[in-house]
Amino acid sequence: MIKIENKFFFILAFSMALVVAISNYLVQFPVNYFALQDLLTYGAFSYPVAFLITDLSNRRYGKNTAKKIVYLGFTLGVFLTFYFSTNYSDLISIRIAIGSGTAFLTAQLIDVNIFDKLRNKIWFTAPLVSSLIGSTIDTFLFFSISFYGTGINWVTLSFGDLFVKIFVALTMLIPFRLLLSHIQENSTIKEKISV
């Protein structure tokens, strides 16, 4: 059973890393429909999935193991970002990687702590509140670090990004609820993963 648990742990961490790398790539592209190019990038649609992964990890394994998944996902995500989507001659690409790493780590660890404090409330309280607060912190840290002083209208982009993240956080309650019963049914052992 421990091997299955370890496998699930690494699947969660790798999924987190993929979400981060994909989002870091997509944030470079504004949504060019319905006059949204000054308000929104495609990264806003994929990044909130990281909070779903963190919250499922926290619910299944607890706070300490969820933090391990965040750290491993962070490390892999930064590596993938630098490898696939960073143009080393472009300062903005490097700032995106640094901004993403800083915002991701800060927001996800805050999400883990808030979720843990609210875990005994009604089922949707912990994932919703922790994701909303984490998304807000992530958005403003990321956009200010990545785009401040570049001439890109990062404040407007950050508000558009946050609006979509709030919407996606609400919709992520559906898969969270669906996966919640599966996670609780399959977590009969309480042994911690030693990674």
What do these predicted regions represent?
Residues I94-K192:
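Membrane-embedded alpha-helical hairpins and interfacial helices in multi-pass inner-membrane proteins
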Residues V20-Q28, L80-Y88, F142, S146, ...:
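Structural signal for membrane-spanning alpha-helices in multi-pass inner-membrane proteins
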Residues M16-V20, Y47, L72-T81, T102-A103, ...:
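Small-residue-rich segments of transmembrane alpha-helices in multi-pass membrane proteins
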Residues I53-S57, F82-D90, L109-I114:
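Membrane-helix exit/interface motif
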Residues L76-F104:
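Helix-adjacent hinge/juxtasegments
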Residues Q28-Q37, N87-I92, T150-L157:
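Membrane-interface helix termini and inter-helical loops of multi-pass transporters
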Residues M1-N64:
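Hydrophobic transmembrane alpha-helices
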Residues F9-A13, N64-T75, I122-V129:
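Cytoplasmic-side transmembrane-helix entry/capping segments in multi-pass membrane proteins
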